[in-house]
């Protein structure tokens, strides 16, 4: 199966966290068929307007959160390019989230 490209909006305060390497996953509505290996292009969005800044990432895992949050997924990603720049970043870590009193370990490869 061919990898798909998903272009999505991302608020400026979260966009900067992505660039700083502090935000490595996305909670997203399960309204697209996100799959491992797909490309995620995050477009910075400020007050209803695209700023032109965008970052490309590869989805490394998709966690279905339906047991905790209906119709949502958690996308794990490895940053690719900060567009139009050519900076490449790789991340590897584990973090924990608390969803409705359940702690879930998230592993980023």
Curated annotation (Swiss-Prot):
The species this protein was found in: Escherichia phage P2 (Bacteriophage P2)
Pfam families: DUF3850
Gene3D superfamilies xrefs: Hypothetical protein
Organism domain of life: Viruses
Name listed for the protein in its UniProt record: Uncharacterized 12.9 kDa protein in GpA 3'region
